[in-house]
């Protein structure tokens, strides 16, 4: 039987070799954390390489994602569908082993990591989802949801502000099945961290309410094992402080930043092999080492035991079992489509001139009755974002059966936690803040788009229309930023009907995040036929049309649709042929076929005006260089909203005059 150190050295060898072959990468962290990984993966982690989607598996997140050869080595050695050739293709085009772990490439990768601090935050979301799902479905004698979330993280993760947001909330909510390992190696890219990171990290986490196990030798298997056992037994989230040597095994580069982010070089790898007593050529693992790492039989046994538990649960609680399966499969209720469409039709038949943020709350109220999988929240703005509805019940440390999270003022943390909730499964997460403060959360939304996962954000107070709070709170460029993000759904509805359609599509869209952008001020409901209501889902549609071919097209979104309609009425009265296009979602419109887009925006009608209280430049792709844009080109001002709209040209008079200039 191989020693634990020898089994850990298999990780070190593969990590050295993979980085060397790619001629780029980070060997230091995998070599430093190999002993911890060996103990965790071989003695504690419940997983099944043959079924990486097993619902009750433990989750493992490598928050210090630059050390990706660590997780690739673990997956390969444990028996996942990740071959030695995949490891040889590390960092190569179209490989399953990209430079940072990416969700959806190699089986067993739970989340995309690399932007430091977001992995630990995703893990908080996963642990939160586990605790909530357990509270909703477990019964006495039937602990059907019962798993841990383990995280590796480095000094960089802890320096990032998002780690404070996430770990503070994790302590408050008592996420006892979250166990984090701090790779305390004292090194970052610039060198020894004491010059820029001298926090007392154990005391920091104690202040959060975590269970802290300090000063664990990260190269002592028995000490690591004892720490994990203690962590699992404690009802609080645990930080295991593991003192490690970066690049352990490299005789001349370990303990320095020289091994952090560059290949060791052939000479140093040979020296490391000799130092570690690893006598095998590059990418060669002996059969006995493979045999001791192989987790397939043990994993199949663990999953089979859980399947038997689930069968007993289903026999005792058939309704709950069916509902849990539906939610874990990401399926919507059977009556969803019919009921949701009826809700939208009823809204069109019963006009209400309300703020679209209120329309959003009404949509939550209507759809929420069908969706026990909703897991809502707001970054301390629930009364403003209007994200709570009659069925909302707040999560508390001692009662996790609810469906609403008070995230506090933590926009970035909230959004990345929601990514973890979505990745875990069983929930449709939505969060909220003012549109302006999506800036704090932007990278987590980008990660959701990159991972192709569901993350619904309610962004209210969407323009200068919020008024007196001024330019610090008035978004200008944010809508364009969201729209320009690949695989992001962005909706800015003009009334309660478009708002409900946007919500319906966001709930249905499992492979992308959605930004729902809503107004503070009241908006007039527009008249529509049933066909027009159907066309809302296409992102852009003809709301008002001219008799005969239009000579001018007004394109508007959100609060400016009402303005476009009024201007069109005046121009029509003066004999102009004007079409109004409501375009709540440019990305949805862009996905329509060419025939539909041509029908809405005929290419031979070049007199076009886009009207939106956001950055003007975005709209040239729709109006062309010969068109006009009534939008924002500066930041806003502090003043009542009506004065600001007038000052910045969002008036019927300005639209009419601009149209006449264009048609002259």
Curated annotation (Swiss-Prot):
This is Transketolase 1. Substrate binds at residues 26, 260, 357, 384, 461, 469, 520. Its cofactor is Mg(2+); Ca(2+); Mn(2+); Co(2+). Its EC number is 2.2.1.1. Thiamine diphosphate binds at residues 66, 114-116, 156, 185, 260, 437. Transmembrane segments: none annotated. One of its GO terms (molecular function) is transketolase activity. Mg(2+) binds at residues 155, 185, 187. The active site is at 411 (proton donor). It comes from Vibrio parahaemolyticus serotype O3:K6 (strain RIMD 2210633). Belongs to the transketolase family. Binds 1 Mg(2+) ion per subunit. Can also utilize other divalent metal cations, such as Ca(2+), Mn(2+) and Co(2+). GO terms for cellular component: cytosol. GO terms for biological process: pentose-phosphate shunt. Keywords: Calcium, Magnesium, Metal-binding, Thiamine pyrophosphate, Transferase. InterPro entries: THDP-binding, Transketo_C/PFOR_II, Transketolase-like_C_2, Transketolase-like_Pyr-bd, Transketolase_bac-like, Transketolase_BS, Transketolase_CS, Transketolase_fam. It comes from the Bacteria. The gene is tkt1. Homodimer. It catalyses: D-sedoheptulose 7-phosphate + D-glyceraldehyde 3-phosphate = aldehydo-D-ribose 5-phosphate + D-xylulose 5-phosphate. It holds the Pfam family Transketolase_N. Catalyzes the transfer of a two-carbon ketol group from a ketose donor to an aldose acceptor, via a covalent intermediate with the cofactor thiamine pyrophosphate. The record marks 26, 260 as: Important for catalytic activity.
